[in-house]
UniProtKB/Swiss-Prot annotation:
Region feature Repeat 1, mapped onto this chain: 5-70
Protein name: ATP-dependent Clp protease ATP-binding subunit ClpC1
Gene: clpC1
Claim: ATP-binding is one of the keywords in the record: yes
Family from the record: Belongs to the ClpA/ClpB family. ClpC subfamily.
Function, in words: ATP-dependent specificity component of the Clp protease. It directs the protease to specific substrates. Can perform chaperone functions in the absence of ClpP.
Positions of ATP binding: 216-223, 553-560
Length: 848
């Protein structure tokens, strides 16, 4: 852009830097550019401002009033603020709109006015110069100074070529001149694609079949290579054969659109080709080259590819194509005659280091657009995090998108007015309404008082808005690595941002949180807690899942419930768990339902039950319930998931499992646990029983699963049988759910120790675990309590106490019955139920 600046415009930039140094500012903002324009003194901008009574001293004093002096003089290079960069971009647009091939002082001033939000615009308004009036003055003076400023242009504009009107009427209608866009500075810089650009130049310089086609994955920079070629042509960095060439991109959609009758499309395409032949200096760029095949071929008409083939073969038409690997294979390779006319140029995905260099090259454009400052750490984070966590897209596109959205996010946050300004607006509106009511009531004394209040509020609001605009908006906001991580977290649901103090505390207390739902099972709770902490601290193996466990042990001891509790801890919802019942996959052919049916089979387009869910929620807990019931082929498919953290679905897409926790539950080796010690509870030799069961479970797992499957599992956890104390604690949890339902009816529920003990005795089975406990509570407590509520024996405002008759606490309790007594809740203790017996709104029970 700076090569288009006139000598006076360049002098303005130098003077702006000097003004920044004088004010001890370590940046060049719009205010310094304005000072430079006035200080220059001879250009159209200076004359325009002088005619409006704007002096250098007046502007300086206003700048010092709004911003003030800096602490110390800056050393070395002083950078432009994003807003100042935006002004310089706008000056180029103003020059192009006026048909000038140079950027003079007047264009910089017009850019300042068009930007309209910086300190410079505030200063002009404060000094009584309306922005529209300043613009009119510049345009008026331009008529007298245009010839003089053009003489200053020097090397700017490359001899005025960009100012000449285009003669390519048809091409301008159906395409876009990339060389003109490059000359006007509208194209982003191209970083590190020298080899690809050189290869394209070599193919274009051939005598025949001089048509390169850029092949690469979406988002790797195929179009950027062509834009780089256009910039090389503009800068003269091409061989003699390509000098003075014009690079046009053809829009096939525009060619086809509106062609209602047979022959319309062919006629348009022939006109384009005729114009290219007449000009002789046109290189055609067709993005999405595969759209040539079949384009316009309705009702028997020949398609665009067939029309272009003869000219491509004879070298009469030079074309650059771009398409993806899949589309090239699907469309171009099938048409051998078309394929041989194009020479493939592979465009690979850049490395993370190369992507960082690309982002640094684009930084100025995004800073100017979003009016923020983007740190080096943000660019490194964008490249590395995008490469690690966004697996279905390619660099540098996904990293650029992260930077772009983070900048947009920061700008939106800063441009939102503070809440106190909205409060002022509400108070002013209220004062006006009250004033009008007072006038209608002819209470003029009150109306005068309200008028004064309104004026005071308006003045206070104006002062607060001035502070906001001159303070917050002129402090350049920074986009750093933390904001990049937050944007990525919003995209993928993977929490990669830094741990807050609250989350750190919560993670350290994770076992305690899980034990609110899980009774006992210390080993299992510790294992999953460590896996989650490892992931959030960033220390897990980046190529494997966050954790993989086999939960083995008797039925009904909390294996599935722990998985649900973990999902609830991470996402706040039990439904966040991806639960796969492996009993549905006992046949070999049912494996395709998990990963997606192969082509040609029913359900191919739908995707797999597992792969689709994980693809949409990559940070999740996946539970494979009762894994031993699945077919052996499924275990083979899961080996790659456990080792490499990825799996290819039926449609060839790679699904990332690196941020999932994989849990397999199994009941293997526990079928003979039916002879407990004592009355259904583990006592005395319980630890020996557990070790015996653990050994048997491990032996059964080794028999059932292949060694390569078990070897990839992080930990095999054998759950304990439940003890008497744990069953009684489960009673408390389950009763809390019933009490929570009663609380909505203004009732409370209290169970005596005897009632809890009898429920535990009747509800526990050594084979089925604690699952029967839920049915026992439903039968003995909920059913009887519902009848008493319907018979109005108990009601709102009462505490229902459940006790036991005919049981001494030791025997089998076959004749024991539960009794329900309703008493009025004391007024002083409205939360008696909560204090007395685990009443209100506890978590879901863990009797599984």
């Amino acid at each position: 852009m700076f090569e288009r600046f006139t000598d006076r415009a360049r002098k303005v930039v130098v003077l702006a830097q000097e003004e920044a140094r004088m004010l001890n500012h370590n940046y060049i903002g719009t205010e310094h550019i304005l000072l430079g324009l006035i200080h220059e003194g001879e250009g159209v901008a200076a004359k325009s401002l002088e005619s409006l009574g704007i002096s250098l001293e007046g502007v300086r004093s206003q700048v010092e009033e709004i911003i003030g002096q800096g602490q110390q003089a800056p050393s070395g290079h002083i950078p432009f603020t994003p807003r100042a960069k935006k002004v310089l971009e706008l000056s180029l647009r103003e020059a192009l709109q006026l048909g000038h091939n140079y950027i003079g002082t007047e264009h910089i001033l017009l850019g300042l006015i068009r930007e309209g939000e910086g300190v410079a615009a505030q200063v002009l308004v404060k000094l009584g110069a309306e922005l529209t009036r300043v613009r009119q003055q510049v345009i008026q003076l331009l008529s007298g100074y245009q010839g003089k400023e053009a003489a200053e242009a020097g090397t700017g504009g490359r001899g005025g070529e960009s100012g000449s009107p285009s003669t390519s009427l048809v091409l301008d209608q159906f395409g876009r001149n990339l060389t003109a866009a490059a000359m006007e500075g509208k194209l982003d810089p191209v970083i590190g694609r020298e080899k690809e650009i050189e290869r394209v130049m070599q193919v274009l310089s051939r005598r025949t079949k001089n048509n390169p086609v850029l092949i690469g994955e979406p988002g790797v920079g195929k179009t950027a290579v062509v834009e780089g070629l256009a910039q090389a042509i503009v800068h003269g960095e091409v061989p003699e054969t390509l000098k003075d060439k014009q690079l046009y991109t053809l829009d096939l959609g525009s060619l086809v659109a509106g062609s209602r009758y047979r022959g319309d499309f062919e006629e348009r395409l022939k006109k384009v080709l005729k114009e290219i032949n007449t000009r002789g200096d046109i290189i055609l760029f067709i993005d999405e080259l595969h759209t040539l095949v079949g384009a316009g071929a309705a009702e028997g008409a020949i398609d665009a590819a067939s029309i272009l083939k003869p000219k491509l073969a004879r070298g009469e038409l030079q074309t650059i194509g771009a398409t993806t690997l899949d589309e090239y294979r699907k469309y171009i390779e099938k048409d051998a005659a078309l394929e041989r006319r194009f020479q493939p140029v592979q465009v690979g995905e850049p490395t993370v280091e190369h992507t960082i260099e690309i982002l640094k090259g684009l930084r100025d454009r995004y800073e100017a657009h979003h009016r923020v400052s983007i740190t080096d750490a943000a660019m490194v984070a964008a490249a590395t995090l995008a490469d690690r966590y966004i697996n279905d897209r390619f660099l540098p596109d996904k990293a650029i998108d992260l930077i772009d959205e983070a900048g947009a996010r920061m700008r939106i946050r800063r441009m939102t007015a503070p809440p106190d300004l909205r409060e002022f607006d509400e108070k002013i509106a209220e004062a006006r309404r009250e004033k009008e009511s007072a006038i209608d009531a002819q209470d003029f004394e009150k109306a005068a008082s309200l008028r004064d209040r309104e004026k005071t509020l308006v003045a206070q609001r104006a002062e607060r808005e001035k502070q906001w605009r001159s303070g917050d908006l002129d402090v350049v906001a920074e986009v750093d690595d933390e904001q990049i991580a937050e944007v990525l977290g919003n995209w993928t649901g993977i929490p990669v941002f830094k741990l807050t103090e609250a989350e750190t505390t919560r993670l350290l207390r994770m076992e305690e949180e899980l034990h609110k739902r899980i009774i006992g099972q210390e080993d299992a709770v510790k294992a999953v807690s460590k896996a989650i902490r490892r992931t959030r601290a960033g220390l897990k193996d980046p190529k494997r899942p966050s954790g993989s466990f086999i939960f083995a042990g008797p039925s009904g001891v909390g294996k599935t419930e722990l998985s649900k509790a973990l999902a609830n801890f991470l996402f706040g919802d039990d439904d966040a768990l991806i639960q796969i019942d492996m009993g549905e996959f006992h046949d070999r052919f049912t494996a395709s339902r998990l990963f997606g049916a192969p082509p040609g089979y029913v359900g191919y387009e739908e995707g797999g039950q597992l792969t689709e869910k994980v693809r949409r929620k990559p940070f999740s807990v996946v539970l494979f319930d009762e894994i031993e019931k699945a077919h052996q082929e499924i275990y083979n498919s899961l080996l790659q998931v456990l080792e490499d953290g990825r799996l290819t679905d039926g449609q060839g897409r790679t699904v990332d499992f690196k941020n999932t926790v994989l849990i397999f539950t199994s009941n293997l080796g526990t079928s003979d646990i039916s002879k407990p010690v004592g009355l259904g509870f583990s006592k005395g030799g319980g630890e020996n029983d557990y070790e015996r069961m653990k050994q048997k479970v491990n032996d059964e797992l080794k028999k059932h699963f292949r060694p390569e499957f078990l070897n990839r599992i992080d930990d095999i956890i054998v759950f304990h049988q439940l003890t008497r104390e744990e069953i009684i604690r489960m009673v408390d949890l389950m009763i809390s759910r019933v009490a929570g339902q009663l609380k909505s009816k203004d009732m409370a529920l209290v169970l005596t120790d005897a009632a809890k003990a009898l429920l535990a005795k009747r509800g526990f089975d050594p084979v089925l675990g604690a699952r029967p406990l839920r049915r026992t509570i439903q039968r003995e407590i909920e059913d009887q309590l519902s009848e008493k509520i319907l018979f109005e024996e108990v009601g709102p405002g009462q505490v229902v106490t459940v006790d036991v008759d005919n049981w001494d606490g030791e025997g089998p309790g076959e004749d024991a019955v539960f009794t329900f007594t309703g008493t009025r809740k004391p007024p002083a203790e409205p939360d008696l139920a909560k204090a007395g017996a685990h009443s209100a709104g506890g978590p879901e029970p863990a009797a599984r």
